[in-house]
């Protein structure tokens, strides 16, 4: 593992509680991304606790994570890098309850030593978001924490407003990050720089010179393990009003 440049990585040691750890987004994006951060030395002093409905133990979760990396990682998996990553993985089944989750987080914090922080990443469907937040409150894991809410945030305006109000009963606004992982893709990140940092295109980037905007999503991905999610959310909410509309806003 390479040396971390000064100023790179979190200021404090982090315990990452990954809710929905065995789900599709976690398998395809989050676990491979966390592995690459670990491999590059960007998350020193980090422990990852997976939480989901699957009845696994830590060894089972590590096995699942390795299979996931072998399938979805864009780079090869070195055994030394994998061993270091596997060492920071832990797992708590949802059925084990808030007390078990708290003990697992406290154990991770003791292993890290010093002043640590908690990052709760909710990779769960909208109908499970509130119960996940309530679990964190029951486990007394709100202090010294940040919470990341993946899209879609609710299923319509009313449910989003309701979820936001209930979320504020537990977390303060400066603890909450509502995100769309699609905007983390490099082409999406580069749109603003391409538009505003380019003296050739910026002056003519307006309705007088642009005839229309077309956004293509040439994906071949099927439902796979997402049938339950799509049954309640649907492709329009999952893709159009989140990924595509947010990309359009950048344009």
Where do the protein language model's features map onto the residues?
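Catalytic cores of eukaryotic secretory-pathway lumenal/extracellular enzymes that build
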Residues: 3, 55-57, 65-75, 103, ...
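Substrate-binding/catalytic subdomain of NAD(P)-dependent oxidoreductase enzymes
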Residues: 228-247
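A contiguous active-site-proximal alpha/beta segment in oxidoreductase catalytic domains
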Residues: 148, 153-220
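N-terminal low-complexity, Ser/Thr- and acidic-residue-enriched intrinsically disordered segments
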Residues: 1-60
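Beta-loop-alpha module in the N-terminal Rossmann-like domain of NAD(P)-dependent dehydrogenases
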Residues: 99-101, 106, 111-146, 153-157, ...
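Short acidic-hydrophobic, aromatic-tinged amphipathic segments that line or gate anion-handling sites
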Residues: 90-97
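Conserved small/polar residues in nucleotide/adenosyl-binding loops
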Residues: 249-251
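Glycine-rich phosphate-binding loop and adjoining beta1-alpha1-beta2 segment
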Residues: 39-90
């Amino acid at each position: 593992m390479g040396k971390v440049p000064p100023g790179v990585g979190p200021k404090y040691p982090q315990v990452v509680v990954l809710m929905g750890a065995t789900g599709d987004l976690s398998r395809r994006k989050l676990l491979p991304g966390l592995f690459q951060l670990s491999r590059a030395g960007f998350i020193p002093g980090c422990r990852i606790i997976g939480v989901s409905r699957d009845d696994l133990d830590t060894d089972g979760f590590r096995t699942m994570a390795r299979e996931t990396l072998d399938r979805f990682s864009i780079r090869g998996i070195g055994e030394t890098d994998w061993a270091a990553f596997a060492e920071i993985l832990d797992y708590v089944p949802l059925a084990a309850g808030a007390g078990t989750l708290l003990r697992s987080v406290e154990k991770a914090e003791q292993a890290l030593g010093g002043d640590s922080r908690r990052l709760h990443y909710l990779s769960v469907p909208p109908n499970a978001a509130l119960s996940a937040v309530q679990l964190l409150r029951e486990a007394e894991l709100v202090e010294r924490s940040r919470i990341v809410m993946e899209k879609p945030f609710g299923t319509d305006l009313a449910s989003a407003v309701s979820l936001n109000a209930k979320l504020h009963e537990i977390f303060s606004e400066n603890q909450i990050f509502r995100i769309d992982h699609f905007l983390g893709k490099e082409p999406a990140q580069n749109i603003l720089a391409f538009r505003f940092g380019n003296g050739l295109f910026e002056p003519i980037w307006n309705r007088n010179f642009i005839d229309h905007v077309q956004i293509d999503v040439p994906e071949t991905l099927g439902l796979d393990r997402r049938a339950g999610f799509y049954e309640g959310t649907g492709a329009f909410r999952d893709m159009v009003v989140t990924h595509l509309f947010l990309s359009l806003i950048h344009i």
